[in-house]
Structures are given as C-alpha cells and as structure tokens.
Design a protein with these regions (language model features):
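Short loop/turn microsegments at loop-to-beta-strand junctions
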Residues: 6, 49, 103-105
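Short aromatic/hydrophobic contact patches that present stacked aromatics
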Residues: 6-8, 51, 77-79
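Core segments of cupin and vicinal oxygen chelate
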Residues: 9-58
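Vicinal oxygen chelate
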Residues: 11, 25, 56-60, 71-72, ...
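A charge-rich, low-complexity, intrinsically flexible signal that marks solvent-exposed coils, linkers
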Residues: 41-43, 74-76, 157-158
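A generic structural micro-feature
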Residues: 44-50, 70-72, 133
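C-terminal cap/linker of serine protease catalytic domains
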Residues: 132-158
Length: 158
C-alpha cells in the first residue's frame, strides 16, 4: 500500500542513480520501483526512467527526472542522527567522497545537490541541554564542517 505522504525530489535525470546510492549508504533504505515514461516528455523520451520510488531511512520518497528547471537547495535537507564518530564519518565520507561538498555545522551536499545534515546525537543533546552547556556546544560546533564528537563532548563538559 502506498503511504499517504511521500517526499518528491526533483532531479535533472539521475533519480535512479541517486536512489541506488541512498539505498546502498543508509540503513532501512531501498529502491522499491522504477517507472519508465510511457511517451516522450519535455525532459526525456519514451522508455527513459521517469520516476523512482525509494526509501531513505524509512522515509518514502519519489525521485522525478524532471529536467534542469529546478535545483535542490538547503531549504530542504535530510537530517541523519548518528550514535558515534564511526557512523558520522561513514555517512559524511560516503556523501562527500562521492562527488559531494562539505558545508558547515554538519551539513553537506551530495553530488546531486541534495543537502544532508549528519548530526551526532551528542550534538543535539548538548544543544537541547540549555544554558551554558548549550552555549558551549554551539560555540564548538560553529567552526566545524563534519562534527567531531570528542570536541563536542569536551565542550559540553566545560
């Protein structure tokens, strides 16, 4: 049964490649269907992959090969919670090392321009603590690209 809510992500032409990458990178992620265009359309031809149904950490998504009209930006991102530095490094390196780009505060973009937040729970816990602990956590995070959990935990302790 199809879910009531699905995130639709517009790609130029690489929705299938992106979905396969996400399925190989993140747990509870898979490609569930590939649909080909039944006729020519403005950004493709009959038989080209038009849409791809997939999940990213259990979130249902639809990749649409709609052409170059619209680009991904930071207004939408997937936030992936991590439990340790190894997991943080693995996801970060998979995204950045596969043609992506580093950004600040745990944010990065994949090679298709989709934004990701690779967010250790130690960071979110420190920011949620309030008061001086949250301030120290925030100040430690601000100059980071990939989050260094040891530095975050040191800042949390003061």
């Amino acid at each position: 049964m199809k879910p009531k809510n699905t995130i639709c992500l517009w790609f130029d032409k690489d929705a299938h490649a992106a979905a396969l990458f996400y399925a190989a990178t993140f747990p509870d992620s898979k490609v569930t269907a590939v649909h080909k265009a039944p006729a020519d359309y403005p950004s493709g031809k009959k038989g080209d992959v038009l849409t791809v149904e997939f999940t990213v950490v259990g979130i249902p998504c639809l990749g649409l090969n709609g052409g170059p009209q619209f680009k991904h930006n930071e207004a939408f991102s997937f936030q992936i919670a991590t439990d340790n530095q190894e997991e943080t490094d693995r996801y970060w390196n998979a995204i950045v090392g596969n043609g992506g780009k580093e950004s600040q505060c745990g944010w990065c973009k994949d090679r298709w321009g989709l934004s990701w937040q690779i967010t250790p729970r130690a960071l979110t816990d420190g920011l949620a603590a309030g008061g001086a602990e949250a301030k120290r956590t925030f100040e430690a995070m601000m100059p980071m690209q990939k989050i260094d959990i040891a530095k975050i935990e040191k800042a949390r302790r003061g």
